[in-house]
Amino acid sequence: ASTAQLVNAETRCLEPALLKELGLTEDNFGRFVYPGDKVGVLTKEIQTITGLGAIPVIAVAGHDTASAVAAVPALDRNFAYLSSGTWSLMGVETDAPVINEETEALNFTNEGGVAGTIRLLKNICGMWLLERCRCDWEEISYPELIAEAEACEPFRSLINPDDVLFVNPMSMEQAIRTYCADHHQPIPETRGQIVRCIFESLSLRYRQVLENLCSLSPRPVEVLHVIGGGSRNDLLNQWTANAVGIPVVAGPSEATAIGNVMIQALTAGAASDVVSMRQLINRSIPLKTFTPENVEVWNTAYLHFLQLA
């Protein structure tokens, strides 16, 4: 409901003014269901198919990212998260919405989280750039692409990953080359150069968004937790740490599924609260920590990136 933007983030109720503009009333909507609410039991049909019996059905977080954020293995609240996949979503958890001219100007959103929290976040382009390039290439593995990228010259070409040019081009590879030509940069010629351009540009974009996020957050950000499928990309994680200048903790990669399970565990009494739930995930899931390296080099590259973005 909060993602649909019909809910007043402060009152946590449907916004009457918006409903009036749309010719709707609260009677047009069902009751709000919150993460952890028991909504019933399995239907007879599903019981027969699965053999599970009349087990309870528990509402998890509102969608995949919300459940993934529930699985962030943080040991305190001074963290930001990056849900990394086709798209990247970066944010912090807050107790109350942050609504002001700055959040509007920077295009941050306030969405519902678990245990009454708000997810103050921004959507960023992610591995979409590489996935679309791979459509144009012969079958090649991620390890091969990463090795080719590592062997290329650093910061030869950079792009703004959120430029409209990359929304849905006929050829992502050609779109990247066009962007570089239009911005008077060397044009990537090889796969490795394109992949390096994508990863370096994403890392620097993450820094830009994180700096904006820190200016909005009610608490300091001391670590960036990368969750989702992109957390398996060690090279991107290391470059992200280099760019943002704080430790990056990667994992779990299956954060959405783990978050779903843990919300059900909370309802079942197997975990006492979100803090203990996250501590359990931290102890149970292999995590990797990446500390910043070559910070001055990345600071210089960031200044160049800002001229593009």
Residue ranges and their predicted role:
Residues 229:
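Glycine-rich Rossmann-fold phosphate-binding loop(s) that bind the pyrophosphate
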Residues 16-37, 261:
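A conserved helix-loop-beta module that forms one wall/lid of the active-site cleft
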Residues 3-16, 20-21, 44-223, 232-256, ...:
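Active-site core segments that coordinate phosphate-bearing ligands/cofactors
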Residues 9-11, 35-39:
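Short beta-strand to alpha-helix junction loop
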Residues 2-6, 27-35, 226:
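A glycine-/small-polar-enriched, mobile loop at the entrance of the PLP active site in fold-type I
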